[in-house]
């Protein structure tokens, strides 16, 4: 008697036999039999009952092959010549195969897929000639494929770039249209030297924001000093900058829960300047007022959704209700603006609401998810560990107390939502609980998938975040760490589209990225230059004669812009618009 295992990824009607267990039961004649399997994260126990005999098969304690990270491509760009293009991209993991996909720019439909084979982690490139392009203009994307992630796999370590003394927030730029796609932002609320876990190279952290590349590199060369702007952060653990959210255009919003610095701040992802979005506000004991109107209070968490003019900023406000226990959710239809000078578009608490300061909010396309720290046995309909607010019903329509699916502590209210895969990560009982959900008539049905203790987090997690591929990031003040795990998947593939401005043309126009510089004046110059282009300018870069980038202007959005070269030494420089051809300019 044996148990036969089938792969039903493609449905029971297309089940594939993947193997049989060894036979440990034999009887004379046929006997009644049954089997059952119990899955625990990446392990499985299989029980076989035949006649009056039973046998258990298990994978626990057995060495299993290492799982890769969930893979994706980032840093997509190209170099153009008269004959064609060199396509550049980076991979966060070794790929078993990579495809260059050419898309119709109008419909998004794939026109051609070009196999690039297996490629290593890191920088890669391929070439394509104009003659091989099947249409006059094409968008393109990179599909990366790697081996399955068979279990919840830690892919971080204890090196200095994972160490932070008092981290409270982690946010990732997940918009391929952003100039900063893939960047990871960690907020650190207090200064000190990391000691948790006894690291061999202990990192000393300052108060502010740390920025990592998608490959966990110090992409901005900031070293151990956080970006803090000109804000006098309190330096008190958990106050500010507390948590972060990244808009689709790369803007980084930060919140502060202290009395003196209450509110929401904007960090420029190019210059790392930080300023309050509430220009001209007066602070009265943690309440911000502009023109006699309440605009914001002490904020424990922020989230963001939408893009462009439809961008909405969500904030958990511990001041607005007048009661520190019952917190309001403020909604600001901020769009493309960097400031806000009036009352929130919405400010209220739902029937299930946030009561604890240790909380999170994740807006999705149909509403928002929120979570908070609740002690063991304290999960209730009014103050649940987690709830979902529906835009359709204008109230909370799900909470973890009805039915009660969490009996343990949800310290410290860390939450991440992968809307594409309908997955939730919630801090539970010193680790993570992962749930799947399905929407029916606007109401989610939530099912626990697995739980995993995370000992290195020191007993609780302060914030979770999924990256573009679905890897899970976590920060813990107690554990003094950023940690990263690959989420289990049987389809470890991801398509990253290039920016829409990076159009491939089968006819050489001499205009790279569909933008050429029409005029730079005055040239030569003693200071300010004005650049005019035929189409919309997204970025302007200035290089010195050695090829080093000395100035950059991003998110221009017009056909004309000005830059001040007064601080540059006299000499020859090169101006590039949208990574196009360089034009010489002389600085006197």
Where are these regions (language model features)?
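Short glycine/acidic-enriched loop and turn motifs that connect beta-strands
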Residues: 1, 53-55, 190-195, 258-261, ...
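Residue-level detector of functionally pivotal "anchor" positions at catalytic/ligand-binding pockets or at interdomain
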Residues: 60-78, 485, 489-521, 527, ...
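C-terminal outer-membrane/trafficking sorting elements
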Residues: 97-119, 133-144, 510-588
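Structural beta-strand segments of beta-rich domains
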Residues: 83-87, 527-529
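Beta-propeller fold detector
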Residues: 13-25, 152-159, 208-235, 273-291, ...
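Blade-level signature of beta-propeller repeat domains, shared across WD40, Kelch, NHL, RCC1
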Residues: 33-66, 458-508
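Conserved beta-propeller blade signature
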Residues: 1, 45-48, 177-187, 251-255, ...
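Repeated scaffold domains used in trafficking and secretory/extracellular systems
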Residues: 29-38, 164-173, 232-245, 284-305, ...
């Amino acid at each position: 008697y044996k148990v036969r295992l089938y792969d039903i990824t493609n449905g029971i009607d297309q089940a594939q036999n993947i193997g049989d267990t060894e036979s440990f039961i034999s009887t004379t004649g046929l006997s009644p039999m049954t089997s059952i399997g119990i899955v625990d994260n990446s392990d499985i126990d299989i029980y076989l009952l035949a006649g009056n005999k039973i046998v258990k098969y298990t994978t626990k304690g057995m060495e299993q092959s290492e799982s890769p990270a969930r893979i994706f491509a980032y840093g997509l760009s190209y170099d153009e010549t008269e004959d064609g293009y060199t396509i550049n991209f980076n991979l966060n993991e070794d790929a078993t195969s990579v495809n260059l996909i050419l898309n119709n720019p109008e419909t998004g439909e794939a026109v051609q897929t070009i196999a690039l084979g297996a490629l290593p982690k890191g920088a890669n490139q391929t070439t394509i000639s104009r003659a091989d392009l099947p249409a006059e203009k094409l968008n393109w994307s990179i599909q990366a494929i790697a081996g399955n992630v068979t279990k919840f796999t830690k892919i971080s370590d204890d090196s200095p770039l994972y160490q932070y003394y008092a981290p409270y927030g982690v946010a990732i730029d997940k918009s391929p249209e952003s100039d900063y796609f893939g960047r990871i932002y960690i907020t650190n609320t207090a200064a000190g030297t990391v000691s948790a876990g006894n690291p061999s190279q202990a990192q000393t952290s300052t108060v502010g924001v740390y920025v990592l590349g998608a490959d966990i590199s110090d992409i901005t060369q900031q070293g151990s000093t956080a970006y803090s702007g000109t804000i006098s952060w309190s330096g008190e653990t958990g106050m500010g900058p507390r948590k972060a959210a990244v808009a689709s255009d790369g803007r980084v919003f930060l919140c502060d829960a202290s009395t003196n610095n209450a509110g929401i701040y904007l960090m420029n992802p190019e210059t790392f300047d930080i300023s309050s979005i509430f220009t001209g506000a007066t602070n009265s004991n943690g309440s911000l007022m502009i023109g006699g109107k309440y605009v914001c209070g002490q904020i424990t968490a922020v989230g963001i959704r939408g893009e462009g003019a439809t961008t909405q900023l969500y904030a958990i406000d511990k001041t607005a209700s007048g009661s520190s226990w019952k917190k309001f959710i403020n909604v600001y239809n901020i769009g493309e603006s960097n400031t806000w000078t009036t009352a929130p578009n919405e400010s209220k608490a739902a029937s299930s609401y946030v009561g604890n300061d240790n909380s999170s909010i994740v807006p999705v396309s149909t509403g928002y998810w929120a979570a908070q720290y609740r002690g063991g046995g304290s999960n209730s309909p009014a103050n649940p560990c987690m709830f979902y607010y529906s835009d359709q019903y204008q109230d909370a329509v799900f909470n973890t107390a009805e039915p009660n699916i969490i009996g343990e502590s949800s310290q410290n209210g860390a939450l991440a939502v992968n809307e594409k895969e309908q997955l939730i990560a919630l801090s539970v009982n010193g680790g993570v609980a992962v749930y799947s959900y399905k929407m029916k008539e606007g109401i989610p049905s939530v099912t626990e998938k697995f739980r995993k203790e995370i000992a290195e987090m020191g007993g609780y997690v302060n914030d979770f975040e999924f990256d573009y591929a679905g890897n899970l990031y976590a920060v813990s003040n107690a554990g003094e760490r950023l940690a990263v795990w690959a989420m289990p998947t049987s389809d470890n593939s991801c398509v990253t589209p290039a920016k829409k401005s990076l159009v491939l043309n089968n006819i050489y126009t001499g205009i790279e990225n569909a933008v050429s510089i029409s005029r730079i004046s005055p040239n030569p110059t003693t200071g300010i230059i004005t650049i005019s282009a035929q189409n919309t300018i997204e970025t302007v870069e200035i290089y010195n004669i050695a090829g080093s980038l000395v100035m950059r202007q991003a998110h221009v959005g017009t056909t004309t812009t000005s830059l001040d070269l007064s601080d540059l030494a006299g000499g020859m420089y090169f101006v590039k618009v949208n990574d196009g051809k360089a034009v010489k300019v002389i600085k006197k």
